[in-house]
UniProtKB/Swiss-Prot annotation:
Core component of the 3M complex, a complex required to regulate microtubule dynamics and genome integrity. It is unclear how the 3M complex regulates microtubules, it could act by controlling the level of a microtubule stabilizer. Acts as a regulator of the Cul7-RING(FBXW8) ubiquitin-protein ligase, playing a critical role in the ubiquitin ligase pathway that regulates Golgi morphogenesis and dendrite patterning in brain. Required to localize CUL7 to the Golgi apparatus in neurons. PROSITE patterns: FN3, IG_LIKE. This is Obscurin-like protein 1. Disulfide bonds join C33-C84, C149-C209, C267-C319, C362-C412, C738-C788, C829-C879, C920-C970, C1011-C1061, C1103-C1153, C1195-C1245, C1289-C1430, C1558-C1608.
């Protein structure tokens, strides 16, 4: 039998989620989802957290894994979010969807045009319905297209067509569209035909026919595709085809894209008629395919998108647009950037048949590079569908069970997003599949196309598994179209086209159009004029929302964070909120927002808050209460609103600010409660003297009262008030207590209606008011109902006594059992008690004992035995013991084969002399087998052993030999197990060398590598540097017995390296180093040479080395040379050269050529050559110049450092005086800056001072200056004032000096005068001419001159900015301004009024600022009104000044005033005018002078004084005069309360009463008493009293903790602190404690009498403080203090101490222990399996007793092996990990009682 783990199944998983639904009120709403799971899940529907149940309108249809919710007659209340929750044993899943219920559409008038918005689709009988819809068509350009639709409906609907969402008259070129209205067949419905004459390519699109009437709207669409007809080939084959496109005039734009990325081209073309667009690549037209998408975006642009670009996509892309008016082109050059890391072998396009497989294969550069597969943008994970294989660097993707949707672009991507792309073509009935997904904006048209292989076939369109209506489907030949016009969110889903077994699917996603929410209301205001009401006003949002909207008003109580909705208002701009609208009294904030179908605006909060009080009504009033003496009396009433109220008792108001209070010391106590609308008054423990009391309740609008009646009762039960249910375990102590209202009153106990009788097992006790029934050791038979009965009243106790719970010790976990047919199966369950009865269940049914199932019970062990198991006996078994269960899963396997192992052929590889064991496992231990080798039965011998052990059969070869190789069979019946043994020799070992060998040799020396093996015939392989060597003349391999040699007869340096002798299982390593021969210089023979060369010249130093491959180094003067253009190194064969192409004298020196072993020296000297003139090569021609012209003489020498001498006519030339001598490298230059006649002559440049040195001569000739003359004359000019005047003339020569004169005076350049020289031209410019600039202008050059006259005309002074009419208020300053075209002199303009010059007035001022002239009138008067003008000699402008009387306004406004009650308030304001008469008002009522009202007016100041103010005078105070009204707030507050006399210091004795008193200034005021700065709260010892203006604090039974400082606080006033001192009371013990001896379980009483009554004592037992509760009761009767201890225990023994102040009394408590006995003993014998744990358990007579566990008489100590437990009276010993050595006798010692258990260990 073998154990395993079970399968937990799979949790629920949603294959299709429910989708949101929008329905009209009254229609059906249906939600559907598909959910799977193992086991099949249970599905429930919820809404608002509540599970839904089926009803008349609600049902839950199910169809396999599909679950639905069907809602009939949907109502607005049904709207909300519905949750589908699926559960099974493996988990839980849920999905949600929203249901929106719309109001039914209201009838609308018939629209006038197609621009009207469409109404919501109707569902009534008269709504439009398409009888015949338009059909999609595919036509060639120039053909005629006819689209027809026929619609029924009442009234007859109006029809109109749209193209791509636009009305036909909005289409750019619709002149060839023709509409033909008509009637349908049989005169049924209306029809409208759209005829398109000579269709053009731009006519392609979606055409939608709309039908509308008063009941609703319907629409149907069709797709029209117009194709370009194919061009016919030319008739003349020799004729070259015409180019498709015109050549580009300019260079195209360039676009780069990384390989594998997308490229997007967009062009925007305009024209009329609308152009036709074609895309071309390198002159070839492009058609859309998998990687080339062509479409038109929403902005009208034409887009070409190339997906996953490859190298073959590079080229020139052209967008060609043409219409009847012409054509235009736009081009871009696409470059595809290839990555550095590339696929070694990229993907190739593949084809496959539907339902077949295809394989994509590529190769990466490195096998360790990870890759990922994609189908377009979707990552593919390995699965049965997509098998991904990696073999080294090869990557394969195998696509199984091809479908039409598998057609597409596939990518393999490695790191760096490097991709290789391939197309997968799926051949099948569907040629062109649907796109993976389609995104459409809400309201747009959705078009889906499918092309099939065969024409005329009928396909099926569906959405989310539901067939779509025929009106939106069209087919034409091979093409099938689905047109969904005006899609909504409900149209979203999975669209499928099915054709036989083929199908293609797309995900239609509808994107919602974003609508902006409405704006918030504006100008919100709050008015609180009326009591308990508030008026809220606002204005509509700006701009107003386009759709209908409402206002939502919300409130928030001050101090709370929650806003609660008050009203929803449609059109009102104001609302009054009364107090009845709030639930509780308080201050409230308000806010408002605008709500429409597009959302909600931000909230706007009204400033301030309003105090509102709900109007309460009495819902349930007070009722008279009758109770018994000592009981609580409860008075309650319910109100209609949450409001505060006051309780009264006999006319005295009860304090409601404290939860508990007392009417007066020693009198009735009460508690006030308020929960929501309910108010309660609880009078606690009422006495007979309180009978007849009158209880009242009062709040605004409600007053009620009731009477209290106390009834006398002989006795009643204080506790328990209700029936008590108790549960105990056997042997546990049970105590039932009933407390009566009277002491020592008799009571009788009953059980199940029968009077009980006292015995040892049932004890009845009475102590004062308490009556007890005790069951010392309860048994199961003691269960029942107990009753304590007295004087007609009873207390009931339900007692249940149960056995202790049973625990399953073994197994602790789920057990899985595997067995075969006829095998015996045992299921064992061990419990912790022997007397426990267990029940066995199989697959939920209780099993019964039979021949095939045996049940065994032995002590705590319970077994279920299947003697001969069958497959049908398998299943889930449970062993149930009490509340615990043990689980077993049994699997019985039928035997189809005798041989269990091995199930396949076994191959065994062994070496000679090794031990080989062949094992075969059978399903039956008694089966006999037959062993054969190579077909012959084997014979057992010392060399071949046959073994048998249970079901195992073995063949053993102790020392296998080579001849033992072969096929061995273990045969039984018709079966056999095959073993193939292959015996080989033991591995070869290398004896020598054991370590790595290192050899050093010289070139041509013989090198021998030797290796000795452990076997002579063992083959070896030799390797050098990892490569196997090949024998040759230079490398010889030898074999001599066990020795193997590798010989290098004449080793070379390249023969060095690492050699390995590989003998298969062992290797030897040799490191050989061959040193090369010495490197020698063969030529020249001499080691030092002297060489001489001319400079500059070519120098080459040469030597030959041996061997030819030797490396050399060159040095110059001890430093290694560096290669450059001036020094070159060469090597050819044995020759080594150093070359100086252009040697200079400085290159002379010692040159050394050095090899590793030798060197040769070259002493190089360089002699300079004589200097030669290199340029010019011949004597230069004479140089002729004019005076002033620069002269440059230049020559080039053969040596840059050569010195030259210049001479002029034989005289040396010196630098300076206009001569400059320069040297630039080999060039020598003489420069004459400005030649004159003295510079004429021969200039000579001589190289060196020695006679006969080379020289070069230059002949320079300077011509005489020509005469200066004027070539052109000046021209007279006439200009306007402010313009520029330009005079120009020409002179010869061009550099002649010219002087300008005006009116005979020489002029110079300045801001107004500008002089310009340009060659021979001379110009004078006079800027901004003035009248004074007129005159004669002269230009003088040498002796010649020319003159011209300048005339300046005056410019008209015109107004550019004219006067504007002005309106002003009396007393303001007025400014009139004009702007002139030019800046005139002062006085050129004048101001007039009424046609006359301005009068002299100090209030009138004029000013000029450049072009601006300004008239200012200060403090304008009514008399200043009139027409004002400004005029010049050439222009005039007028304007009207209107003056209105001065407006009355406030200079200093009214201010809010706050005063205390009885005080006075002064309001004052200052106006802008004097002598104004106004009215004062308060709260809207006009005020008149009186004793409390004083009104004053002084000049512009107005004052109001109000005196003797009260709280009711708070409100608004206003002043009104003419059109002016201003207001302020008057706030009257209560006079603050003050403390007239504070509390005084007190000193009291402990236990006495302390009284503090303070006196206030007012009678009605609340006082807070504080102690040490902390507020005091009411308690039984603390009382507060109010006597007029006096406030008392009474502190009863003072103790030391009451000492401290006390003060009273009222408002902001605080009294001086008063100190309370508490003196300790002298206490003495009058009667000492007495010691007590008692037996365990009994009680003990201690009494102590002290000298003082009001004293608190403290009890201790054994040093521990005692507190009442449980087994301890403490009470005080006057001076006597009593301690009662019940149910004594041995640990209670100790010293009892009572202490009261300094007094103390001690006594001794002795508790005699009862003998400890065993109630339940452990079993005499217990059997435990090995490695399990054993539990021994014993129950003793009382808890707390000591139990000792021993083994073989030795006490056991707790630890890892042994664990002791105690639970009440039960003691356990747990032995962990039981071993055979743990077997023996275990003893338990409890007091004088003991018990033994024999522990037996079963198993190996």
């Amino acid at each position: 039998m073998k154990a395993g783990s079970g399968d937990q199944g799979s949790p629920p998983c949603f294959l299709r989620f429910p989708r949101p639904v929008r329905v009209v009120s009254g229609a059906e709403a249906e939600l559907k989802c598909v959910v799977l799971g193992e086991p099949p899940p249970t599905v429930v529907w919820e809404k608002g957290g509540q599970q839904l149940v089926a009803s008349e309108r609600l049902s839950f249809p199910e169809d396999g894994a599909e679950h639905g919710l069907l809602l009939s007659g949907a109502l607005p209340t049904d709207a909300g979010v519905y949750v589908c929750r699926a559960r099974n044993a493996a988990g839980e899943a849920y999905a949600a969807a929203a249901v929106t219920v719309l109001e039914p559409p209201a009838p609308e008038p018939e629209p006038e045009s197609s621009e009207c918005p469409l109404p919501t689709p109707g569902t009534g009988e008269g709504a439009p319905k398409f009888l015949t819809g338009p059909q999609s068509q595919w036509v060639l350009r120039g053909e005629e297209v006819v689209l027809t639709c026929q619609v029924g409906g009442l009234p007859e609907p109006k029809l109109y067509w749209e193209k791509d969402g636009m009305a036909l008259d909005e289409v750019w070129d619709s002149s060839h569209f023709k509409l033909e209205p008509g009637r349908g067949a049989s005169d049924e419905g209306a029809s409208l035909t759209l005829r398109i004459l000579a269709a053009r390519l731009p006519d392609s699109g979606v055409y939608v026919c709309h039908a509308r009437n008063a009941h609703g709207h319907a629409q149907a669409g069709a797709l029209l595709q117009v194709h370009q007809p194919r061009e016919s080939p030319p008739q003349d084959p020799d004729e070259n085809p015409k180019p498709v496109l015109e050549p580009l005039k300019g260079a195209p734009k360039t676009f780069w894209v990384n390989e594998g990325k997308h490229a997007k081209f967009r062009c925007y073309v305009m024209g009329k008629p609308e152009p036709e667009i074609e895309w071309h690549l390198e002159g070839r037209p492009l058609l859309p395919d998998r990687r080339r998408l062509m479409y038109r975006d929403r902005d009208g642009g034409f887009v070409l998108k190339v997906l996953y670009c490859q190298a073959k996509d590079r080229g020139l892309y052209v967008c060609a647009a043409r219409n009847s008016a012409g054509q235009t082109l736009s081009a871009v050059q696409l470059h595809v950037k290839e990555p550095r890391l590339r696929f070694t072998r990229p993907l190739q396009d593949v084809e496959g048949r539907e339902h077949g497989i295809v394989v994509l294969e590529c190769k990466v550069p490195n096998s360790r590079i990870p890759t990922a597969w994609f189908r377009e943008d979707q990552r593919l994970l390995p699965c049965r569908k997509y098998e991904q294989i990696e073999e080294g660097a090869v990557r394969r993707l195998v696509i199984h069970k091809l479908k039409a949707d598998d057609d597409g672009v596939y990518l393999c991507e490695m790191r760096g997003r490097v991709r290789t792309v391939a197309n997968v073509t799926v051949k099948g009935p569907i040629l062109k599949r649907l796109p993976r997904k389609l995104d459409v904006l809400e309201g747009e048209n959705a078009v889906l196309l499918v092309e099939t292989q065969e024409a005329g076939v009928q396909g099926c369109w569906s959405r989310d598994g539901e067939d779509l209506p025929d009106t939106c489907q069209s087919s034409c030949g091979h093409m099938h179209a689905l047109v969904l016009p005006g899609v909504t969110r409900e149209d979203a889903g999975e669209i499928t086209f099915s054709l036989g077994n083929s199908r293609t699917t797309t995900l239609l996603r509808v994107k919602c159009v974003k609508h902006s929410p409405p704006g918030p209301p504006v100008m919100v205001e709050m008015f609180k004029g009326q009591k308990n009401k508030v008026l809220l006003t606002w204005k509509p949002p700006e701009p107003p929302p386009e759709t209908s909207f409402i206002y939502r008003l919300e409130r928030q109580e001050v101090g709370s964070d929650d806003w609660i909705q008050c009203f929803s208002i449609e059109k009102a701009g104001a609302v009054e909120v009364p107090g009845d609208c709030v639930p509780t009294e308080g201050d409230y904030h308000f806010r408002i927002c605008t709500v429409s179908e597009h959302g909600r605006s931000p909230h706007v909060v009204f400033n301030g808050s309003a105090h509102l009080v709900p109007t309460a009504r009495l819902v349930s009033g007070l009722e008279d209460v009758q109770v018994y003496d000592g009981e609580d009396a409860v008075f309650s009433l319910d109100l209609s609103a949450i409001i505060q109220g006051s309780w009264f008792l006999n006319g005295e108001q009860l304090q409601s600010n404290e939860p508990e209070g007392q009417v007066e010391p020693g009198a009735l106590r009460y508690r006030i409660e308020q929960k929501g609308l309910q108010h309660r008054l609880i009078l606690q423990a009422v006495k007979h003297r309180d009978s007849g009391a009158l209880v009242g309740f009062s709040c605004p609008g409600v007053q009620d009262s009731a009477a209290l009646t106390i009834q006398e009762s002989s006795v009643h039960i204080l506790s328990p008030q209700d029936k008590v249910s108790l549960t105990f375990t056997t042997s546990e102590r049970v105590v039932l207590t009933c407390e009566l209202s009277r002491v020592d009153f008799p009571a009788t106990w009953y059980k199940d209606g029968q009077k009980v009788e006292e015995s040892e097992s049932l004890i009845v006790k009475t102590e004062g008011r308490k009556h007890r029934l005790i069951l010392p050791e309860a048994q199961v038979r003691d269960s029942g109902e107990f009753e304590c009965r007295t004087e007609g009243v009873s207390a009931f106790f339900g007692v249940t006594v149960q056995d202790p719970p049973v625990h399953i010790v073994n197994p602790q976990e789920h057990v899985f059992v595997h067995a075969i047919t006829s095998e015996c199966v045992r299921l064992t369950c061990e419990v912790d008690r022997e007397d426990t009865t267990v029940h066995w269940y199989k697959d939920g049914q209780e099993v019964e004992e039979s021949d095939i199932i045996v049940l065994e019970n032995k002590g705590p062990h319970h077994r279920l035995v299947l003697p001969a198991a069958r497959p049908s006996d398998g299943g889930e078994f449970q062993c149930v013991a009490g509340d615990e269960r043990a689980y077993f899963t049994v699997t019985i396997t039928d035997v189809f084969s005798w041989i269990v192992y091995p199930s396949s052929e076994v191959h065994v590889a062994a070496v000679r002399l090794e031990r080989v064991v062949l094992t075969c496992e059978l399903c039956r231990p008694w089966a006999e087998v037959r062993w054969t080798k190579d077909g012959e039965e084997v014979v057992e011998s010392p060399a071949l052993l046959l073994e048998k052990e249970d079901t195992i059969r073995r063949l053993v070869l102790p020392s296998v030999q080579l001849e033992d190789s072969g096929e061995y069979l273990c045969e039984i019946h018709d079966e056999s197990a095959s073993f193939t043994i292959t015996v080989t020799e033991p591995p070869v070992r290398i004896i020598y060398p054991q370590d790595e060998v290192t050899l050093h040799a010289v070139s041509l020396e013989c090198v021998v590598l030797t290796c000795e093996l452990s076997r002579e015939d063992a083959p070896v392989r030799w390797y050098k540097d990892g490569l196997e060597v090949e024998e040759s003349e230079a490398l010889v391999l030898q074999s001599d017995g066990p020795r193997r040699r590798l010989v290098l007869p004449a080793a070379q340096p390249e023969d060095g390296g690492e050699f390995v002798c590989d003998a298969g299982d062992d290797s030897a390593f040799f490191t050989v180093t061959v040193t090369a021969p010495p490197e020698r210089i063969v030529h020249p023979a001499a080691r030092s040479l002297d060489l001489q060369f001319g400079a500059p010249g070519h120098v080459e130093l040469r030597c030959e080395v041996a061997p030819a491959g030797s490396q050399v180094r060159w040095y110059k003067d001890g430093l290694e040379v560096e290669v450059s253009d001036a020094l070159q190194l060469g090597a050819e064969g044995p020759a080594r050269t150093l070359t100086l192409p252009h040697a200079q004298p400085e290159d002379a020196g010692e040159y050394v050529c050095e090899t590793r072993d030798e060197a040769v020296t070259f002493n190089v000297s360089l002699a300079e050559l004589p200097v030669q003139f290199l340029a010019p090569e011949a004597a230069p021609n004479p140089l002729c110049v004019v005076p002033g012209e620069p002269v440059v003489l230049s020559c080039e020498l053969s040596r840059a450092s050569a010195q030259v001498f210049w001479s002029h006519n034989g005289s040396p030339v010196q630098q300076g005086e206009g001569l400059e001598l320069r040297a630039e490298g080999p060039r020598r230059i003489l420069c004459i800056q400005a030649a004159d006649l003295a510079h004429t002559g021969v200039y000579t440049c001589q190289s060196g001072a020695s006679p006969g040195a080379p020289s070069l001569s230059f002949n320079v000739q300077v011509a005489e200056l020509p005469p200066v003359k004027l070539v052109s004359e000046l021209t007279p000019l006439t200009v306007h004032e402010g313009d520029d005047a330009t005079f120009q003339c020409e002179v010869s020569p061009p550099d002649a000096e010219v002087t300008w004169l005006r009116n005979g005076a020489v002029i110079t350049a300045g801001p107004q005068l500008e002089m310009v020289q340009n060659g021979s031209s001379r110009t004078l410019i006079i800027r901004g001419c003035q009248l004074k600039d007129a005159g004669t202008v002269t230009a003088r050059a040498g002796a010649a001159d020319t003159s011209a006259r300048l005339h300046v005309r005056e410019t008209e002074l015109l107004f550019l900015r004219r006067l504007q009419d002005v309106r002003a208020e009396e007393g303001q300053d007025v400014h009139l301004e004009v702007e002139t075209g030019r800046v005139g002199a002062a006085g050129t303009v004048r101001w007039i009024r009424g046609g006359e010059p301005l009068p002299l007035d100090s209030r009138l001022t004029t000013a000029q600022d450049g072009h601006v002239h300004r008239l200012s009138i200060h403090g304008v008067l009514l008399t200043d009104q009139g027409t004002y003008g400004c005029e010049s000699r050439h222009d005039r402008t007028l304007a009207r000044l209107s003056v209105r009387p001065r407006q009355l306004r406030e200079l200093r406004p009214l201010e809010d005033v706050t005063v205390h009650e009885g005080g006075s308030a002064t309001f004052q304001l200052e106006l802008s005018q004097e002598g104004v008469t106004g009215e004062w008002a308060q709260g809207g009522v006009r005020l008149h002078p009186g004793p409390k009202c004083h009104i004053q007016s002084e000049g512009r100041t107005h004052r109001l004084v109000l005196s003797g103010l009260g709280l009711a005078d708070s409100g608004c105070v206003s002043f009104t005069a003419d059109t002016l009204r201003c207001a302020a707030r008057l706030t009257v507050r209560e006079v603050p309360v003050t403390i007239v006399q504070g509390p005084q210091d007190l000193e009291v004795t402990e236990g006495d009463t302390a009284t503090f008193e303070c006196e206030l200034s007012q009678t009605l005021a609340d006082v807070i008493w504080e102690k040490d700065g902390q507020a005091l709260s009411l308690s039984p010892r603390l009382r507060l009293q109010a006597l007029g203006t006096r406030r008392l604090l009474l502190l009863r039974r003072c103790c030391s903790s009451d000492a401290g400082t006390y003060s009273c606080v009222v408002g902001t006033a605080r009294s001086e602190p008063a100190r309370l001192t508490v003196r300790e009371r002298e206490v003495s013990v009058l009667r000492e404690l007495r010691s007590v001896s008692a037996r365990e379980g009994d009680g003990a009483t201690f009494e102590c009498t002290v000298s003082e009554t009001e004293i608190t004592g403290r009890w201790e037992l054994g040093g521990r403080a005692l507190r009442p509760g449980g087994r301890v009761r403490i009470r005080q009767e006057g001076k006597k203090h009593i301690l009662v201890l019940s149910e004594l225990r041995t640990e209670d023994t100790g010293e009892v101490c009572f202490q009261a102040g300094p007094a103390q009394s001690l006594a001794r408590l002795e508790v005699e222990a009862l003998p400890l006995q065993m109630c339940r003993r452990p079993p005499r014998e217990k059997t435990v399996l090995v490695n399990r744990r054993a539990v021994l358990e014993v129950t003793v007579s009382r808890p707390g007793g000591h139990v000792c566990w021993m083994r073989e008489g030795v006490e056991l100590c707790p630890g890892n092996k042994y664990e002791t437990r105690r639970h009440g009276t039960t003691h356990s010993l747990v032995i962990h990990d039981v071993r055979p050595e743990d077997q023996g006798t275990y003893s338990c010692q409890a007091g004088q009682d003991s018990a033994d258990t024999q522990l037996l260990v079963d198993g190996d």
